[in-house]
Amino acid sequence: MTRNIRVEELTQRPVEKQKIEVVERKGLGHPDSVADGIAEEISRALCKEYIERFGRVLHHNTDKIQIVAGRSRPAFGGGEVIQPQYILLTGRATRVCGDVEVPVDAIALRTARNHLKRALRNLDLDTHVIIDCKIGTGSADLCDIFDRDASTVPSANDTSYGVGYAPLSETERIVYSTEQELLSLRSRIPAIGEDIKVMGLREDDTIYLTIACAMVDRYIDDLDHYVETKKEIVEEISAKAQSMTRRRVDVQMNVGDNIATGSVYITVTGTSAEMGDDGAVGRGNRANGLITPNRPMSLEATSGKNPINHVGKIYNLLSNLIAKEIAEEVDGVEEVYVKILSQIGKPISQPHIASVQLVLKEGVRLSSAHARAREITDRWLEDIPRVQQMIFHGELQTY
């Protein structure tokens, strides 16, 4: 059956040539990212368990994780957590298949603890956090849509859409890599906490990076040491960012600090969830790891949704894969925007529409790019099982 794929030229100024660009990334230890990470890891763990027990993935969605912030008393040299943060694991999962019961709660709790151990090095799992599992069972109608597809192309669980684009702009790449660079510096500067937010503003040819980094108090002796450490971090990030662009880069960090009064951003655990910052799945980065107001975005939470028929997950990841390949393989294309829309109950390989919009380089005609862009889109839609496998194996980021 022929798919409804529409390829058209999009006439607009490419983001790289716009005067103002804003890009954000919430880092690994930001409460929203922690919620995303736990949700996705639980989904992946359930997929593994279902496949081992039943030979296929059963219905589940674990995309409703909530983090309620605790209270702490940070202090130079080491403070204390007064009230632990509370993490509520919710969502839906198949608990019984035939006469076999799946230990969903045990899997979810173990997976959440393992993720926290990896994501937040200074978090004491025994005293700094309470994890509660309230994952329920799925609704009968959605489970039926899921189960009827055991040996066929999955049917969409919802009428929804996914959005992707390529390539990343220079500012987008710098914002993303800034958080990665900060994480890599932890071995040398252990005071760097994992709760990082990078806000990038490009105004004409100047890129401003505003960084919030939760510093870990036990590794900082006093206010002078804090100021010195902060200066060292800014210098490292400035050098890294400047190496990626010919534009001028201005880096500032923890701009809410008041050095005169000694009010600075230090934490006990390296995350603001210890003292007032709640978190939830879907409130942070989009599927490509960024928040990009200059680009089309879907508000769907990608993390934690099942990778078999939940189009809120599959189409967002698929759209980015399609856009990336078109941008890399089709000559004359400056930007690619992909939107894929489903209809509930219809095969996910047959979307209601797959829209591919191409911003072409000067002098390039749509006719030279149309066929190849359509062929790439069609092939990826045919190969959705490959996307599912990439999700199973953790090859695609969701936040």
From Swiss-Prot:
GO biological process: one-carbon metabolic process; S-adenosylmethionine biosynthetic process
Catalytic activity: L-methionine + ATP + H2O = S-adenosyl-L-methionine + phosphate + diphosphate
InterPro entries: AdoMet_synthase_2_family, AdoMet_synthase_3, S-AdoMet_synthetase_arc
Enzyme class: transferase
Pfam families: AdoMet_Synthase
Pathway: Amino-acid biosynthesis; S-adenosyl-L-methionine biosynthesis; S-adenosyl-L-methionine from L-methionine: step 1/1
Binding-site residues for ATP, renumbered to this chain: 136-141
A GO MF term: magnesium ion binding
EC number(s) from the headed UniProt entry: 2.5.1.6
Cofactors that this protein relies on: Mg(2+)
Source organism superkingdom: Archaea
NCBIfam families reported for this sequence: PRK04439.1-3, PRK04439.1-5
Family under the similarity heading: Belongs to the AdoMet synthase 2 family.
Function: Catalyzes the formation of S-adenosylmethionine from methionine and ATP.
Protein name: S-adenosylmethionine synthase
Provenance organism: Methanothrix thermoacetophila (strain DSM 6194 / JCM 14653 / NBRC 101360 / PT) (Methanosaeta thermophila)
Phylogenetic lineage: Archaea, Methanobacteriati, Methanobacteriota, Stenosarchaea group, Methanomicrobia
Gene transcribed to yield this protein: mat
